[in-house]
Amino acid sequence: MRKYETVFILNPTLDEEGYKANVEKFKGVIENAGGTVDNVDLWGKRKLAYEVKKVSEGYYTLMNFTADTELPKELDRVFRITDTVIRHMIITQE
C-alpha cells in the first residue's frame, strides 16, 4: 500500500450538494477498491489561474489516500469520464 495525494477541480456550476456528492463518489471509488481515505480538504470555489474548458473558476478539493498501485489508474479513469471534473492530478507521497 502506498500513500497518494490527489487534487481535483470541479465545475463551478454545481451547487454545494452536487459538489459534496461528487467528492463522496470519488471517496467511494477509493474505499470500494480497498483503499482508505486519510484526509479530505474542501477548498471551495476559487479562481483558476487561466481558463480551462471556458471556465474561470472551480471547486478545489485535496484528498490524501492510501491504496495499492492499481487504484490510481482506476481513479484517473473515473476522473476522466466524469463531466464535472475540469482538471485532476494524482501524485505519490514520499
From Swiss-Prot:
Keywords: Ribonucleoprotein, Ribosomal protein, RNA-binding, rRNA-binding
GO annotation, cellular component aspect: cytoplasm; ribonucleoprotein complex; ribosome
Record carries keyword RNA-binding: yes
Short name of any one Pfam family annotated for the protein: Ribosomal_S6
Biological process, per Gene Ontology: translation
Lineage: superkingdom: Bacteria
Protein's UniProt keywords contain rRNA-binding: yes
Molecular function GO labels: small ribosomal subunit rRNA binding; structural constituent of ribosome
Family: Belongs to the bacterial ribosomal protein bS6 family.
Stated role: Binds together with bS18 to 16S ribosomal RNA.
Family annotation (PANTHER family): MITOCHONDRIAL 28S RIBOSOMAL PROTEIN S6, SMALL RIBOSOMAL SUBUNIT PROTEIN BS6M
Protein name: Small ribosomal subunit protein bS6
Source organism (scientific name): Clostridium botulinum (strain Hall / ATCC 3502 / NCTC 13319 / Type A)
